[in-house]
């Protein structure tokens, strides 16, 4: 979730050459003027309520990709439902405990590496194939000291790591610009339509968190999920995508396009 970047203060902006050495730019097929959009929903497997909303957004024709929490309480049911939707791309949403709460000691790189390896192995075992992209809960993979570990994993499986490929990441569609403080105006139809109209040629990802409110009292991002779901499935959003000539794709499609362009 985007607010973590600002409150943690460890954005991986200084990786520069190191990141480039590990993960060369991936060139996508298509005309230079083509506008491709990945709409990726985080937190698949977190709960039955979240998963229900996520799948509704996919079934409505807007969400094209999802990031799976392999330690999520609803992960097995989520995978079963995802198999019924072959057009939905699935990546991994690496977390550092069973509900994705912030890991207290990200300086322990051996422990971080162990978690990355364990969760990737679990993903392959449960899903039956590697993820089509790698990211993390609360964007922890962008922390300067651990970003390299994620980049190595991306290179190992030849898949993009969110924020370290030529996919332009747009994370502003989020209802808590300050952690714990809801601002539903940030996830309105008007805001999303403006984002869509601003999509440039190439490949862009808009991150989202659709779902239904959970019954547990400790849910951090809850009613915002339902607002996101309503916004994503609004007819004006679909109309704008069509009018703008935006082509919706998944990370799986992006990977195939990148291979074809080589």
Placement of each model-derived feature along the sequence:
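Structural preference for beta-strand elements that scaffold enzyme active sites
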Residues: 36-38, 63-65, 87-91, 131-133, ...
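N-terminal secretory signal peptides and thylakoid transit peptides that target proteins
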Residues: 1-18
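C-terminal domain-boundary segment and adjacent tail
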Residues: 219-262
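C-terminal segment of N-terminal export signals and the immediately downstream linker at the start
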Residues: 24-40, 45
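Active-site beta-loop-alpha junctions enriched in small/polar residues
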Residues: 42-44, 69-71, 93-99, 137-139, ...
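Acidic (Asp/Glu)-rich catalytic clusters
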Residues: 54-59, 77-91, 124-125
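A short alpha/beta connector and helix-capping loop motif
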Residues: 48-72
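Catalytic domains of cell-wall/extracellular-matrix polysaccharide-remodeling enzymes
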Residues: 120-199
């Amino acid at each position: 979730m985007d607010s973590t970047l600002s409150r943690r203060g460890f954005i991986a902006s200084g990786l520069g050459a190191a990141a480039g050495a590990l993960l060369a730019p991936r060139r996508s097929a298509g005309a230079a003027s083509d506008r491709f959009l990945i709409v990726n929903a985080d937190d698949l497997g977190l709960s039955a309520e979240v998963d229900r909303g996520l799948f509704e957004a996919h079934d409505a024709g807007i969400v094209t990709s999802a990031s799976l929490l392999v330690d999520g309480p609803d992960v097995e049911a989520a995978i079963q439902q995802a198999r019924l939707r072959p057009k939905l791309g699935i990546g991994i949403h690496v977390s550092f405990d069973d509900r994705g709460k912030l890991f207290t000691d990200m300086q322990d790189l051996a422990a971080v590496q162990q978690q990355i390896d364990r969760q990737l192995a679990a993903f392959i075992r449960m899903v039956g194939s590697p993820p089509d992209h790698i990211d993390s809960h609360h964007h922890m993979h962008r922390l300067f000291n651990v970003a390299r570990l994620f980049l190595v994993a991306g290179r190992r499986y030849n898949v993009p790591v969110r924020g370290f490929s030529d996919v332009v990441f747009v994370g502003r569609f989020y209802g808590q610009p300050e952690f714990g403080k809801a601002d539903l105006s940030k996830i309105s139809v008007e805001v999303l339509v403006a984002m869509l109209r601003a999509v440039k040629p190439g490949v862009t990802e808009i991150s989202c968190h659709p779902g239904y409110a959970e019954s547990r009292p400790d849910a951090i991002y809850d009613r915002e999920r339902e607002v996101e779901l309503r916004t994503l499935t609004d007819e004006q959003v679909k109309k704008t995508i069509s009018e703008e000539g935006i082509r919706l794709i998944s990370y799986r499609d992006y990977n195939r396009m990148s291979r074809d362009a080589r």
